[in-house]
């Protein structure tokens, strides 16, 4: 287990235990995803909360001010606990570990699909079905990214499996076969 996981796992498991006891798992998963998006969209926030110069009480006030009307009380209390324990600086790692453990417990595979352009809902549905068949899982969480250098098509990865159906890859293969 990597060092960061040895720190993040107990916190992630504790949060999962609380939400399971309160039967709030799906609600919390959605809130955690929204919180991660919010933090990722405001890198200065994470930098501020990670600052060793700020006192714990100041960090708690910032957390309350920003998040009290955006997240449920269980998640807010969890963030305050992380501030108290000097772990708020690794909040994104803890929340990502929470999502990872939830997926493991629920047998949900995580697939990342990178395409040249934004995928339509129909395209996402077709890709999801194909990946479910290939990965041999019943449930799939799809994360989409855009990379114009693919020219067209997509690259999907689930665990250690990669499906490269991009135009850039096909052009590269054609170039290699012509050079022989």
From Swiss-Prot:
Protein known as: ATP synthase subunit delta
Any one of the GO CC terms: proton-transporting ATP synthase complex
Coiled coil: none
Organism: Prochlorococcus marinus (strain MIT 9515)
Quaternary assembly: F-type ATPases have 2 components, F(1) - the catalytic core - and F(0) - the membrane proton channel. F(1) has five subunits: alpha(3), beta(3), gamma(1), delta(1), epsilon(1). CF(0) has four main subunits: a(1), b(1), b'(1) and c(10-14). The alpha and beta chains form an alternating ring which encloses part of the gamma chain. F(1) is attached to F(0) by a central stalk formed by the gamma and epsilon chains, while a peripheral stalk is formed by the delta, b and b' chains.
Bilayer topology term: Peripheral membrane protein
Pfam families, A to Z: OSCP (PF00213)
Family designation: Belongs to the ATPase delta chain family.
GO molecular function, one term: proton-transporting ATP synthase activity, rotational mechanism
Tagged with keyword Amino-acid biosynthesis: no
Localisation per UniProt entry: Cellular thylakoid membrane
Function: F(1)F(0) ATP synthase produces ATP from ADP in the presence of a proton or sodium gradient. F-type ATPases consist of two structural domains, F(1) containing the extramembraneous catalytic core and F(0) containing the membrane proton channel, linked together by a central stalk and a peripheral stalk. During catalysis, ATP synthesis in the catalytic domain of F(1) is coupled via a rotary mechanism of the central stalk subunits to proton translocation. This protein is part of the stalk that links CF(0) to CF(1). It either transmits conformational changes from CF(0) to CF(1) or is implicated in proton conduction.
Assigned keywords, A-Z: ATP synthesis, CF(1), Hydrogen ion transport, Ion transport, Membrane, Thylakoid, Transport
Keyword Protease: no
PANTHER family reported in the protein's UniProt record: ATP SYNTHASE DELTA CHAIN (PTHR11910)
InterPro entries according to UniProt: ATP_synth_OSCP/delta_N_sf, ATPase_OSCP/dsu
């Amino acid at each position: 287990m990597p060092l960061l996981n040895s720190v993040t796992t107990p916190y992630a498991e504790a949060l999962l235990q609380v939400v399971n006891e309160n039967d709030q798992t799906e609600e919390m998963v959605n809130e955690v995803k929204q919180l991660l998006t919010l933090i990722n969209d405001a890198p200065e926030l994470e930098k501020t909360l990670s600052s060793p110069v700020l006192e714990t009480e100041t960090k708690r006030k910032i957390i309350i001010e920003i998040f009290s009307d955006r997240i449920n009380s269980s998640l807010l209390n969890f963030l305050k606990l992380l501030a108290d324990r000097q772990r708020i600086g690794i909040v994104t790692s803890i929340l990502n570990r929470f999502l990872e453990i939830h997926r493991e417990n629920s047998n949900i595979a995580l697939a990342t699909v990178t395409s040249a352009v934004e995928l339509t809902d129909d395209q996402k549905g077709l890709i999801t079905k194909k990946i479910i068949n290939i990965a041999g899982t019943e449930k799939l969480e799809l994360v989409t990214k855009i990379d114009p250098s693919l020219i067209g098509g997509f690259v999907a990865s689930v665990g250690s499996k990669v499906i490269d159906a991009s135009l850039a890859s096909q052009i590269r293969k054609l170039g290699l076969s012509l050079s022989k």
